[in-house]
Amino acid sequence: MPRPIHAVIHQPALANNLDIIRGKAPESRIWAVVKANAYGHGIRRVFAALRGADGFGLLDLNEAVLLRDLGWQGPILLLEGFFQPQDVAVIEQYRLTTAIHCDEQLRMLESARAKGPLAIQLKLNTGMNRLGFHPAAYRTAWERARAMPCVGSIVHMTHFSDADSARGVAHQIEAFDAATANLPGEASLSNSAAVLWHPQAHRAWVRPGIILYGASPTGRDADIAGTGLQPAMSLHSELISVQDLQPGDTVGYGSLFTAERPMRIGVVACGYADGYPRHASGWGEQRAPVLVDGVRTELVGRVSMDMLCVDLTPCPKARVGSPVTLWGQGLPIDEVAQASGTVGYELMCALAPRVPTSVATITASDSAAPAVA
């Protein structure tokens, strides 16, 4: 028998989250962002649930080709554009939309001799200072793109740096509107946080990412409470050992946890080689939460490569074989991430290939049935 650890990708949750996003931005078309292999969920696993989107956004040409192989005929956006002149031929062959964010990409496009018409999204740097043309150079970049015979539609695009914070998006919208004034073309501004909290930024296209998968753009689950968003990934395992500790006994490498009273702990078949964060806290004031037999408890000690330990005080009936939820439905991934000094995005993307993953599928009655993927 294999180790009991396994992950589940919940297609009904993905479809639910897409519906909620549609309700938040009813006048906008949706790029479902599936970069990083759908934030670790797997493009193959999420495709059926997200094909109601208007397009898919990603980074990798191979992932774009995979979507075409899965039967997707709609738009696919390369969010970082292309990296070599020869990529333009692949973009043309597979009918991809590409971002253009720098002079080098414009030069490559000019020299590629594509037949077109190519759909491009010209990226404006409104303050993120990562990718995009500065406002003073944007109109010139647009005119260069417009003059290329291979270029068809041009969408104006930017990315928000503070849509999930008190600073907000007003300053970036102002810069965007000033730089694109009197230029024809649709606009795409909103990331997940702007979809939820800044309707003035929705425009023609929105680009939700993390909220498709049921986690919070801020890293705080409380911030999406009441939205109806559901976690699309659950990570489960079982107890493989139970230990009885006496006061003064320590747990794990570095002896970071010391028992202050007689207590039982459980050993879970999950470690950092499975994608669980080694820096998850099992000592001090904020210990990482875990569910054992559906009961909330906490980590004790340091996470090892293949195992971690949990306090069984709240779970007196727990024994070897008791089910454990590391994150997912019933335990928000953002809570685990907060206790690990990171964000839910990272935990999703870090799920290790060695973890068997199944799919809870969408059936005709909208009920979930597990299927291995």
UniProtKB/Swiss-Prot annotation:
N6-(pyridoxal phosphate)lysine PTM sites in chain numbering: K35
Function text: Catalyzes the interconversion of L-alanine and D-alanine. May also act on other amino acids.
Family: Belongs to the alanine racemase family.
PANTHER family per record: ALANINE RACEMASE, ALANINE RACEMASE, CATABOLIC-RELATED
Enzyme superclass (EC): isomerase
Gene3D superfamilies, sorted: Alanine racemase (3.20.20.10), Lyase, Ornithine Decarboxylase, Chain A, domain 1 (2.40.37.10)
Catalysed reactions listed for this entry: L-alanine = D-alanine
GO CC terms, sorted: cytosol
Cofactor: pyridoxal 5'-phosphate
GO MF term (any one): alanine racemase activity
Positions that bind substrate: R130, M305
EC numbers on record: 5.1.1.1
Pathway named in the protein's UniProt entry: Amino-acid biosynthesis; D-alanine biosynthesis; D-alanine from L-alanine: step 1/1
Keyword annotations: Isomerase, Pyridoxal phosphate
Catalytic-site annotation from UniProt: K35, Y253
Listed Pfam families: Ala_racemase_C (PF00842), Ala_racemase_N (PF01168)
Protein name: Alanine racemase
NCBIfam families xrefs: alr (TIGR00492)
GO biological process terms on file: D-alanine biosynthetic process
Gene responsible for this protein: alr
The keyword Isomerase is assigned to this record: yes
